[in-house]
């Protein structure tokens, strides 16, 4: 990768938002990475749905996230459990043949 200096004319490349509250959370780095990707998907992704309460949720297979972060689907499953235990996501099983509905949550008082 070729790198260049930042100047006044430099534009910010595509990026993912890293919420400050994650800095103080006791979760692994990969969990933070997956949460950031899910948060980005929840705000700008094509797999976003809205439930009857007006809450956004994602529908995806672990393989989708695994390909983004270059890890295995089982690593993603473990990471999603960690995020759920931390209260940052909520998973709802709709049926065995469909992907989970994953709600990405923000701590009370936090906005993106």
Where are the regions that the model predicts?
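Short, amphipathic alpha-helical interaction segments positioned at domain boundaries
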Residues: 108-112
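Residue-level signal for threonine
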Residues: 19, 106-107
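Winged helix-turn-helix DNA-binding recognition segment
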Residues: 42-106
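Short recognition helix of helix-turn-helix/winged-helix DNA-binding domains
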Residues: 1-63
């Amino acid at each position: 990768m070729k790198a260049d200096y930042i100047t006044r004319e430099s534009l910010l490349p595509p990026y993912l938002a890293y919420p400050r509250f994650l800095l103080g959370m006791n979760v692994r780095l990969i969990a933070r990475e997956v949460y950031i990707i899910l948060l980005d998907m929840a705000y700008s992704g094509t797999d976003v749905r809205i439930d009857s309460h007006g809450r956004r949720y994602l529908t995806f297979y672990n393989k989708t996230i695994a390909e983004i972060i270059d890890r295995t689907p089982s690593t993603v499953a473990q990471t999603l459990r960690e995020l759920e235990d931390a209260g940052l996501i909520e998973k709802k099983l709709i049926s065995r043949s469909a992907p989970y509905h994953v709600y990405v949550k923000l701590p009370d008082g936090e906005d993106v």
